[in-house]
């Protein structure tokens, strides 16, 4: 006596998380031949092999990895840079622009940078991160004579976009990702980075530091700004 086998069917299985996954089920009705040659039915058996896909695997995790890399980079590079400002603070949506068309510089707490107060706590030669144009981490520079430089230095490496810490001991910016180096004004002196760090004007408006896009000649290279 021939046995009957049903074709595989597709079943929607539910997981504990409420998500569903497709599984293939095979329904078989086996026959058993006894000593008298008679067929005896057994219960219908259903074998279901489900392949569940975790929810996290369904969502691209590139953004999550990038964010964690940025935060980790900041934590690892702080001892090298000798700074107390966590880089993660600066990866927030940029604030509204100032009335003059510039972007107010923000400190690690998100407060406006008051030039006179900044100079009281940052000595000559200091380079400290603030939030600049488009929310980019940007260094405010204190000149050797104790005045605030009229330019800010974008901290994003021109190689692959890592945040570059300032190494005060060597008086230059050194990227921890692939070893690119820039002098204390952000001009590239060693690859693989192909270009110098971008600049922004650092103006003072009503006592506050304001960043304005730099579209003039790059004073470090004598060339047009590649970022404009």
Curated annotation (Swiss-Prot):
<dbReference type="GO" id="GO:0005886">
    <property type="term" value="C:plasma membrane"/>
</dbReference>
<dbReference type="Pfam" id="PF25471">
    <property type="entry name" value="TM_PetC"/>
</dbReference>
<feature type="domain" description="Rieske">
    <location>
        <begin position="115"/>
        <end position="211"/>
    </location>
</feature>
<keyword id="KW-0408">Iron</keyword>
<keyword id="KW-1278">Translocase</keyword>
<dbReference type="GO" id="GO:0016491">
    <property type="term" value="F:oxidoreductase activity"/>
</dbReference>
<feature type="binding site">
    <location>
        <position position="159"/>
    </location>
    <ligand>
        <name>[2Fe-2S] cluster</name>
    </ligand>
</feature>
<keyword id="KW-0812">Transmembrane</keyword>
<keyword id="KW-0479">Metal-binding</keyword>
<keyword id="KW-0249">Electron transport</keyword>
<dbReference type="GO" id="GO:0051537">
    <property type="term" value="F:2 iron, 2 sulfur cluster binding"/>
</dbReference>
<keyword id="KW-0001">2Fe-2S</keyword>
<dbReference type="InterPro" id="IPR023960">
    <property type="entry name" value="Cyt_b6_f_Rieske"/>
</dbReference>
<keyword id="KW-1133">Transmembrane helix</keyword>
<dbReference type="GO" id="GO:0009496">
    <property type="term" value="F:plastoquinol--plastocyanin reductase activity"/>
</dbReference>
<comment type="similarity">
    <text>Belongs to the Rieske iron-sulfur protein family.</text>
</comment>
<comment type="subunit">
    <text>The 4 large subunits of the cytochrome b6-f complex are cytochrome b6, subunit IV (17 kDa polypeptide, petD), cytochrome f and the Rieske protein, while the 4 small subunits are petG, petL, petM and petN. The complex functions as a dimer.</text>
</comment>
<dbReference type="InterPro" id="IPR005805">
    <property type="entry name" value="Rieske_Fe-S_prot_C"/>
</dbReference>
<protein>
    <recommendedName>
        <fullName>Cytochrome b6-f complex iron-sulfur subunit 1, chloroplastic</fullName>
        <ecNumber>7.1.1.6</ecNumber>
    </recommendedName>
</protein>
<dbReference type="Pfam" id="PF00355">
    <property type="entry name" value="Rieske"/>
</dbReference>
<comment type="function">
    <text>Component of the cytochrome b6-f complex, which mediates electron transfer between photosystem II (PSII) and photosystem I (PSI), cyclic electron flow around PSI, and state transitions.</text>
</comment>
<keyword id="KW-0150">Chloroplast</keyword>
<dbReference type="GO" id="GO:0045158">
    <property type="term" value="F:electron transporter, transferring electrons within cytochrome b6/f complex of photosystem II activity"/>
</dbReference>
<keyword id="KW-1015">Disulfide bond</keyword>
<feature type="transit peptide" description="Chloroplast">
    <location>
        <begin position="1"/>
        <end position="49"/>
    </location>
</feature>
<keyword id="KW-0934">Plastid</keyword>
<keyword id="KW-0813">Transport</keyword>
<dbReference type="GO" id="GO:0046872">
    <property type="term" value="F:metal ion binding"/>
</dbReference>
<keyword id="KW-0793">Thylakoid</keyword>
<dbReference type="InterPro" id="IPR036922">
    <property type="entry name" value="Rieske_2Fe-2S_sf"/>
</dbReference>
<feature type="transmembrane region" description="Helical">
    <location>
        <begin position="72"/>
        <end position="92"/>
    </location>
</feature>
<keyword id="KW-0411">Iron-sulfur</keyword>
<keyword id="KW-0809">Transit peptide</keyword>
<keyword id="KW-0472">Membrane</keyword>
<dbReference type="InterPro" id="IPR014349">
    <property type="entry name" value="Rieske_Fe-S_prot"/>
</dbReference>
<dbReference type="InterPro" id="IPR017941">
    <property type="entry name" value="Rieske_2Fe-2S"/>
</dbReference>
<feature type="binding site">
    <location>
        <position position="175"/>
    </location>
    <ligand>
        <name>[2Fe-2S] cluster</name>
    </ligand>
</feature>
<dbReference type="GO" id="GO:0009535">
    <property type="term" value="C:chloroplast thylakoid membrane"/>
</dbReference>
<feature type="binding site">
    <location>
        <position position="157"/>
    </location>
    <ligand>
        <name>[2Fe-2S] cluster</name>
    </ligand>
</feature>
<feature type="binding site">
    <location>
        <position position="178"/>
    </location>
    <ligand>
        <name>[2Fe-2S] cluster</name>
    </ligand>
</feature>
<feature type="disulfide bond">
    <location>
        <begin position="162"/>
        <end position="177"/>
    </location>
</feature>
């Amino acid at each position: 006596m021939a046995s009957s086998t049903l074709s595989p069917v597709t079943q929607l299985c539910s997981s504990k998380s409420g998500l569903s996954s497709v599984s293939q089920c095979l329904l078989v009705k086996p026959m058993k031949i006894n000593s008298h040659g008679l067929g005896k039915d057994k219960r219908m058996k259903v074998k279901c092999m489900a392949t569940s896909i975790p929810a996290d695997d369904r969502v691209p995790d590139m953004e999550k990895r990038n964010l964690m890399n940025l935060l980790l980079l900041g934590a690892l590079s702080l001892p090298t840079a000798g700074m107390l400002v966590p880089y993660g603070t600066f990866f927030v949506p940029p604030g509204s622009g100032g009335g003059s068309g510039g972007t107010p510089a923000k400190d690690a707490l998100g407060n406006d940078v008051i030039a006179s107060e900044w100079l009281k706590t940052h000595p000559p030669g200091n380079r400290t991160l603030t939030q600049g144009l488009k929310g980019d981490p940007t260094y405010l520079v204190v000149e050797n004579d104790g005045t605030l430089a009229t330019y800010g230095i974008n901290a994003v490496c021109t190689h692959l976009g890592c945040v570059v810490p300032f190494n005060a001991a060597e008086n230059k910016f050194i990227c921890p990702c692939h070893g690119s180096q820039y002098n204390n004004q952000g001009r590239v002196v060693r690859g693989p980075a192909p270009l110098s760090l971008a600049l922004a004007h650092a103006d003072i408006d009503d006592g506050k530091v304001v960043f304005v896009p730099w579209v003039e000649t790059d004073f470090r290279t004598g060339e047009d700004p590649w970022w404009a």
